[in-house]
Protein backbone atom coordinates (compact mmCIF):
# COMPACT_ATOMS: atom_id res chain seq x y z
CA UNK A 1 0.00 0.00 0.00
CA UNK A 2 2.80 2.43 0.87
CA UNK A 3 4.51 1.72 -2.45
CA UNK A 4 1.27 2.35 -4.35
CA UNK A 5 0.76 5.63 -2.48
CA UNK A 6 4.17 6.89 -3.58
CA UNK A 7 3.56 5.84 -7.17
CA UNK A 8 0.18 7.60 -7.17
CA UNK A 9 1.77 10.82 -5.94
CA UNK A 10 4.22 10.72 -8.87
CA UNK A 11 7.19 11.12 -6.56
CA UNK A 12 10.42 12.23 -8.22
CA UNK A 13 12.63 10.76 -5.49
CA UNK A 14 11.60 7.37 -4.12
CA UNK A 15 13.38 5.69 -1.17
CA UNK A 16 12.48 2.05 -0.53
CA UNK A 17 13.64 0.14 2.57
CA UNK A 18 13.52 -3.64 2.03
CA UNK A 19 10.56 -3.29 -0.37
CA UNK A 20 10.41 -6.99 -1.28
CA UNK A 21 10.23 -8.32 2.29
CA UNK A 22 6.44 -8.62 2.02
CA UNK A 23 6.28 -9.53 -1.67
CA UNK A 24 6.32 -12.79 -3.57
CA UNK A 25 8.97 -13.29 -6.30
CA UNK A 26 6.36 -12.50 -8.95
CA UNK A 27 5.29 -9.31 -7.16
CA UNK A 28 8.93 -8.30 -6.74
CA UNK A 29 9.49 -8.69 -10.47
CA UNK A 30 6.49 -6.48 -11.21
CA UNK A 31 7.75 -3.86 -8.76
CA UNK A 32 11.16 -3.80 -10.41
CA UNK A 33 9.55 -3.30 -13.83
CA UNK A 34 7.67 -0.29 -12.45
CA UNK A 35 10.85 1.12 -10.89
CA UNK A 36 12.70 0.80 -14.19
CA UNK A 37 9.94 2.76 -15.92
CA UNK A 38 10.17 5.45 -13.22
CA UNK A 39 13.92 5.66 -13.74
CA UNK A 40 13.46 5.97 -17.49
CA UNK A 41 11.03 8.84 -16.85
CA UNK A 42 13.61 10.77 -14.85
CA UNK A 43 12.87 9.61 -11.30
CA UNK A 44 15.58 8.83 -8.75
CA UNK A 45 15.08 5.55 -6.89
CA UNK A 46 17.06 4.51 -3.80
CA UNK A 47 16.63 0.92 -2.64
CA UNK A 48 17.96 -0.30 0.71
CA UNK A 49 18.20 -4.09 0.71
CA UNK A 50 20.33 -6.93 2.04
CA UNK A 51 19.58 -9.16 -0.97
CA UNK A 52 22.54 -8.99 -3.31
CA UNK A 53 20.66 -10.62 -6.18
CA UNK A 54 18.16 -7.74 -6.07
CA UNK A 55 20.96 -5.17 -5.97
CA UNK A 56 22.52 -6.64 -9.08
CA UNK A 57 19.18 -6.98 -10.85
CA UNK A 58 17.65 -3.54 -10.36
CA UNK A 59 20.38 -0.96 -9.64
CA UNK A 60 22.62 1.16 -11.86
CA UNK A 61 25.02 2.09 -9.05
CA UNK A 62 25.66 0.57 -5.62
CA UNK A 63 26.71 2.43 -2.46
CA UNK A 64 28.21 0.19 0.24
CA UNK A 65 28.01 1.06 3.93
CA UNK A 66 30.12 -0.54 6.67
CA UNK A 67 29.86 0.40 10.34
CA UNK A 68 27.83 3.48 9.46
CA UNK A 69 30.31 4.83 6.91
CA UNK A 70 30.26 4.86 3.12
CA UNK A 71 33.17 2.74 1.92
CA UNK A 72 32.54 2.72 -1.84
CA UNK A 73 30.17 3.51 -4.69
CA UNK A 74 30.49 1.33 -7.78
CA UNK A 75 28.71 0.77 -11.07
CA UNK A 76 26.58 -2.35 -10.93
CA UNK A 77 27.74 -3.43 -14.38
CA UNK A 78 31.35 -3.48 -13.14
CA UNK A 79 30.86 -5.56 -9.99
CA UNK A 80 29.46 -8.87 -8.75
CA UNK A 81 28.20 -10.46 -5.53
CA UNK A 82 31.67 -11.49 -4.31
CA UNK A 83 33.14 -8.01 -4.81
CA UNK A 84 30.18 -6.37 -3.06
CA UNK A 85 30.44 -8.79 -0.16
CA UNK A 86 34.14 -8.07 0.25
CA UNK A 87 33.40 -4.34 0.40
CA UNK A 88 30.59 -4.89 2.92
CA UNK A 89 32.58 -7.12 5.26
CA UNK A 90 36.09 -5.80 4.72
CA UNK A 91 37.50 -9.21 3.79
CA UNK A 92 36.86 -12.06 1.39
CA UNK A 93 34.07 -14.49 2.23
CA UNK A 94 32.68 -17.56 0.51
CA UNK A 95 29.11 -17.13 -0.70
CA UNK A 96 28.10 -20.76 -0.49
CA UNK A 97 25.78 -22.51 1.94
CA UNK A 98 26.24 -26.19 2.69
CA UNK A 99 23.32 -28.60 2.91
CA UNK A 100 24.77 -31.68 4.61
CA UNK A 101 22.89 -34.94 4.11
CA UNK A 102 21.23 -36.02 7.34
CA UNK A 103 22.22 -39.35 8.86
CA UNK A 104 19.06 -39.42 10.98
CA UNK A 105 15.57 -40.71 10.29
CA UNK A 106 12.20 -40.39 11.97
CA UNK A 107 9.96 -37.59 13.19
CA UNK A 108 10.73 -35.37 16.16
CA UNK A 109 7.46 -33.47 16.25
CA UNK A 110 4.11 -34.05 14.59
CA UNK A 111 1.75 -31.09 14.34
CA UNK A 112 -1.88 -31.92 13.62
CA UNK A 113 -4.69 -29.48 12.68
CA UNK A 114 -3.13 -26.62 14.67
CA UNK A 115 -5.49 -23.64 14.91
CA UNK A 116 -4.96 -20.40 16.85
CA UNK A 117 -6.75 -17.06 17.20
CA UNK A 118 -5.68 -13.53 18.08
CA UNK A 119 -7.32 -11.40 20.78
CA UNK A 120 -10.06 -10.35 18.35
CA UNK A 121 -11.02 -13.93 17.58
CA UNK A 122 -9.47 -13.89 14.10
CA UNK A 123 -7.74 -17.12 13.13
CA UNK A 124 -3.97 -16.73 12.78
CA UNK A 125 -3.23 -20.41 12.13
CA UNK A 126 -5.81 -22.53 10.37
CA UNK A 127 -5.65 -26.32 10.46
CA UNK A 128 -1.85 -26.49 10.12
CA UNK A 129 -0.47 -30.04 9.81
CA UNK A 130 3.17 -31.08 9.23
CA UNK A 131 6.07 -32.99 10.78
CA UNK A 132 9.58 -31.97 11.81
CA UNK A 133 12.21 -34.67 11.33
CA UNK A 134 15.48 -35.42 13.10
CA UNK A 135 18.48 -33.80 11.47
CA UNK A 136 16.33 -31.65 9.22
CA UNK A 137 16.07 -27.94 8.49
CA UNK A 138 12.43 -27.28 7.64
CA UNK A 139 12.02 -23.82 6.16
CA UNK A 140 8.81 -21.82 6.56
CA UNK A 141 8.12 -19.32 3.77
CA UNK A 142 5.33 -16.85 3.15
CA UNK A 143 4.67 -13.16 2.77
CA UNK A 144 4.83 -11.21 6.03
CA UNK A 145 1.87 -11.82 8.31
CA UNK A 146 0.98 -15.26 6.96
CA UNK A 147 1.24 -16.93 10.37
CA UNK A 148 4.98 -17.54 10.67
CA UNK A 149 5.34 -15.70 13.99
CA UNK A 150 2.26 -17.39 15.44
CA UNK A 151 3.48 -20.82 14.36
CA UNK A 152 6.84 -20.67 16.08
CA UNK A 153 5.44 -19.04 19.22
CA UNK A 154 2.69 -21.65 19.44
CA UNK A 155 5.13 -24.55 19.18
CA UNK A 156 7.33 -22.84 21.77
CA UNK A 157 4.34 -22.72 24.12
CA UNK A 158 3.87 -18.95 24.09
CA UNK A 159 0.44 -18.85 22.43
CA UNK A 160 -2.80 -20.59 23.32
CA UNK A 161 -4.09 -23.27 20.97
CA UNK A 162 -7.72 -23.28 19.97
CA UNK A 163 -7.57 -26.68 18.29
CA UNK A 164 -5.01 -29.32 17.32
CA UNK A 165 -2.09 -31.26 18.75
CA UNK A 166 1.71 -31.09 18.94
CA UNK A 167 2.97 -34.65 19.40
CA UNK A 168 6.34 -35.85 20.65
CA UNK A 169 6.56 -39.65 20.64
CA UNK A 170 2.76 -39.70 20.28
CA UNK A 171 2.31 -37.57 23.44
CA UNK A 172 0.54 -34.22 23.12
CA UNK A 173 2.67 -31.49 24.69
CA UNK A 174 0.12 -28.68 24.38
CA UNK A 175 -0.62 -27.23 27.80
CA UNK A 176 2.44 -28.77 29.46
CA UNK A 177 4.89 -26.63 31.42
CA UNK A 178 8.53 -26.32 30.30
CA UNK A 179 9.56 -28.64 33.13
CA UNK A 180 7.06 -31.27 32.01
CA UNK A 181 8.22 -30.97 28.40
CA UNK A 182 11.85 -31.47 29.44
CA UNK A 183 10.90 -34.56 31.46
CA UNK A 184 9.42 -36.31 28.42
CA UNK A 185 12.64 -35.77 26.47
CA UNK A 186 12.30 -32.51 24.55
CA UNK A 187 15.07 -29.96 24.79
CA UNK A 188 13.64 -27.03 22.86
CA UNK A 189 15.39 -23.78 21.98
CA UNK A 190 13.64 -20.75 20.53
CA UNK A 191 15.34 -17.82 18.80
CA UNK A 192 12.54 -15.24 18.50
CA UNK A 193 12.14 -12.43 16.01
CA UNK A 194 12.34 -9.82 18.80
CA UNK A 195 15.88 -10.43 20.03
CA UNK A 196 16.05 -7.83 22.80
CA UNK A 197 12.38 -7.74 23.73
CA UNK A 198 11.80 -11.49 23.98
CA UNK A 199 15.13 -13.29 23.55
CA UNK A 200 17.52 -11.38 25.79
CA UNK A 201 17.39 -8.87 28.64
CA UNK A 202 18.79 -5.72 27.07
CA UNK A 203 20.11 -4.20 30.30
CA UNK A 204 22.05 -7.32 31.29
CA UNK A 205 25.45 -8.45 30.09
CA UNK A 206 26.27 -11.52 28.08
CA UNK A 207 27.12 -13.69 31.09
CA UNK A 208 23.88 -12.86 32.91
CA UNK A 209 21.83 -13.52 29.77
CA UNK A 210 23.44 -16.95 29.44
CA UNK A 211 22.36 -17.66 33.03
CA UNK A 212 18.71 -17.33 32.02
CA UNK A 213 19.00 -20.79 30.49
CA UNK A 214 21.05 -22.31 33.31
CA UNK A 215 20.14 -20.71 36.60
CA UNK A 216 18.46 -23.89 37.90
CA UNK A 217 21.51 -26.07 37.27
CA UNK A 218 23.47 -24.89 40.31
CA UNK A 219 24.01 -27.15 43.31
CA UNK A 220 23.44 -24.34 45.82
CA UNK A 221 20.55 -21.92 46.41
CA UNK A 222 22.72 -19.16 44.97
CA UNK A 223 23.26 -18.36 41.31
CA UNK A 224 26.73 -19.45 40.21
CA UNK A 225 28.23 -17.17 37.58
CA UNK A 226 31.52 -18.99 37.10
CA UNK A 227 30.21 -21.38 34.45
CA UNK A 228 28.32 -18.60 32.65
CA UNK A 229 31.46 -16.49 32.45
CA UNK A 230 33.43 -19.45 31.12
CA UNK A 231 30.76 -20.12 28.50
CA UNK A 232 30.70 -16.42 27.54
CA UNK A 233 34.41 -16.48 26.75
CA UNK A 234 33.98 -19.70 24.78
CA UNK A 235 31.18 -18.23 22.64
CA UNK A 236 33.06 -14.97 22.07
CA UNK A 237 35.89 -16.98 20.53
CA UNK A 238 33.71 -19.52 18.68
CA UNK A 239 31.25 -17.03 17.16
CA UNK A 240 33.62 -14.06 16.93
CA UNK A 241 31.35 -11.90 19.10
CA UNK A 242 32.49 -8.29 19.32
CA UNK A 243 31.82 -6.92 22.82
CA UNK A 244 33.74 -4.64 25.21
CA UNK A 245 33.23 -7.26 27.92
CA UNK A 246 30.97 -10.07 29.10
CA UNK A 247 29.27 -7.70 31.55
CA UNK A 248 28.53 -5.01 28.95
CA UNK A 249 24.73 -4.64 28.48
CA UNK A 250 23.79 -6.46 25.29
CA UNK A 251 21.78 -3.44 24.09
CA UNK A 252 25.13 -1.75 23.42
CA UNK A 253 26.14 -4.45 20.93
CA UNK A 254 25.46 -4.42 17.20
CA UNK A 255 22.52 -6.40 15.84
CA UNK A 256 24.79 -9.13 14.54
CA UNK A 257 26.54 -9.58 17.87
CA UNK A 258 23.24 -9.57 19.76
CA UNK A 259 22.04 -12.37 17.49
CA UNK A 260 25.25 -14.32 18.04
CA UNK A 261 24.80 -14.10 21.82
CA UNK A 262 21.22 -15.37 21.52
CA UNK A 263 22.15 -18.12 19.05
CA UNK A 264 25.11 -19.21 21.15
CA UNK A 265 23.04 -19.45 24.31
CA UNK A 266 20.36 -21.54 22.64
CA UNK A 267 22.61 -24.01 20.82
CA UNK A 268 24.79 -24.52 23.89
CA UNK A 269 21.77 -26.01 25.65
CA UNK A 270 22.05 -28.97 23.22
CA UNK A 271 18.49 -28.78 21.87
CA UNK A 272 16.85 -31.54 19.88
CA UNK A 273 14.31 -29.01 18.57
CA UNK A 274 15.45 -25.54 17.48
CA UNK A 275 13.00 -22.86 16.33
CA UNK A 276 14.40 -19.76 14.64
CA UNK A 277 12.39 -16.74 13.50
CA UNK A 278 14.18 -14.54 10.96
CA UNK A 279 17.56 -15.56 12.35
CA UNK A 280 19.60 -13.31 10.02
CA UNK A 281 17.30 -10.30 9.67
CA UNK A 282 19.38 -7.12 9.83
CA UNK A 283 22.71 -8.99 9.95
CA UNK A 284 25.67 -8.39 7.68
CA UNK A 285 26.72 -11.08 5.21
CA UNK A 286 29.53 -12.40 7.42
CA UNK A 287 27.28 -12.76 10.49
CA UNK A 288 24.57 -14.37 8.37
CA UNK A 289 26.88 -17.09 7.13
CA UNK A 290 28.07 -17.70 10.69
CA UNK A 291 24.43 -18.37 11.59
CA UNK A 292 23.96 -20.74 8.64
CA UNK A 293 27.10 -22.68 9.60
CA UNK A 294 25.91 -23.07 13.18
CA UNK A 295 22.48 -24.25 12.08
CA UNK A 296 24.14 -26.91 9.94
CA UNK A 297 26.26 -27.97 12.91
CA UNK A 298 23.07 -28.56 14.89
CA UNK A 299 21.54 -30.45 11.97
CA UNK A 300 24.52 -32.82 11.92
CA UNK A 301 23.84 -33.57 15.59
CA UNK A 302 20.28 -34.66 14.79
CA UNK A 303 18.52 -31.47 15.82
CA UNK A 304 15.24 -30.73 14.07
CA UNK A 305 15.27 -27.07 13.02
CA UNK A 306 12.25 -24.97 12.12
CA UNK A 307 13.64 -22.06 10.12
CA UNK A 308 11.31 -19.13 9.49
CA UNK A 309 12.94 -16.98 6.83
CA UNK A 310 12.27 -14.36 4.16
CA UNK A 311 15.13 -14.83 1.69
CA UNK A 312 13.98 -17.58 -0.66
CA UNK A 313 17.39 -17.90 -2.31
CA UNK A 314 18.94 -18.76 1.06
CA UNK A 315 16.13 -21.14 1.98
CA UNK A 316 16.53 -23.04 -1.29
CA UNK A 317 20.21 -23.63 -0.44
CA UNK A 318 19.96 -24.19 3.31
CA UNK A 319 16.72 -26.07 3.93
CA UNK A 320 15.84 -29.69 3.25
CA UNK A 321 12.12 -29.01 2.86
CA UNK A 322 10.16 -25.78 2.64
CA UNK A 323 6.64 -25.33 4.00
CA UNK A 324 4.68 -22.39 2.60
CA UNK A 325 2.05 -20.49 4.57
CA UNK A 326 -0.66 -18.22 3.17
CA UNK A 327 -3.15 -16.52 5.51
CA UNK A 328 -2.35 -19.03 8.26
CA UNK A 329 -2.79 -22.13 6.09
CA UNK A 330 -0.24 -24.55 4.68
CA UNK A 331 -0.42 -24.28 0.90
CA UNK A 332 2.41 -26.70 0.20
CA UNK A 333 5.41 -28.60 1.58
CA UNK A 334 8.14 -29.14 -1.02
CA UNK A 335 11.63 -30.60 -1.33
CA UNK A 336 14.03 -27.64 -1.52
CA UNK A 337 16.19 -29.43 -4.10
CA UNK A 338 13.29 -29.94 -6.51
CA UNK A 339 11.48 -26.60 -6.45
CA UNK A 340 12.06 -23.15 -7.93
CA UNK A 341 11.64 -19.73 -6.36
CA UNK A 342 8.79 -19.01 -8.77
CA UNK A 343 6.91 -22.15 -7.70
CA UNK A 344 7.24 -21.13 -4.06
CA UNK A 345 5.99 -17.68 -5.02
CA UNK A 346 2.82 -19.21 -6.46
CA UNK A 347 2.28 -21.15 -3.22
CA UNK A 348 2.78 -17.93 -1.24
CA UNK A 349 -0.20 -16.42 -3.05
CA UNK A 350 -2.22 -19.67 -2.87
CA UNK A 351 -2.34 -19.77 -6.67
CA UNK A 352 -3.41 -23.41 -6.54
CA UNK A 353 -6.55 -22.61 -4.54
CA UNK A 354 -5.92 -24.75 -1.45
CA UNK A 355 -7.19 -22.03 0.88
CA UNK A 356 -10.46 -21.74 -1.01
CA UNK A 357 -10.92 -25.51 -0.97
CA UNK A 358 -10.27 -25.62 2.77
CA UNK A 359 -12.68 -22.76 3.43
CA UNK A 360 -15.40 -24.66 1.62
CA UNK A 361 -14.72 -27.67 3.84
CA UNK A 362 -14.94 -25.46 6.96
Segments predicted by a language model, with ranges:
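Glycine-rich phosphate-binding loops of nucleotide-dependent enzymes
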Residues: 1-362
Amino acid sequence: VEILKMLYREAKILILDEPTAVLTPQESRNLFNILRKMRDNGCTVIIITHKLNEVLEISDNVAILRKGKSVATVKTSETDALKLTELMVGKKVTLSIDRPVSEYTGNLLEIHHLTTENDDGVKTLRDVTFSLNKGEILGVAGVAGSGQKELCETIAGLMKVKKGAILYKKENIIGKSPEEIIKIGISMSFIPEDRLGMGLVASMGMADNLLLKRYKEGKTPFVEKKEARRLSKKLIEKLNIKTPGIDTPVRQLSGGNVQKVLLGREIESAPNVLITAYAVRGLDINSSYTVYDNLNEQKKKGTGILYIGEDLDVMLELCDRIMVLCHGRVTGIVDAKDVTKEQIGLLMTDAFGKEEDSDEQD
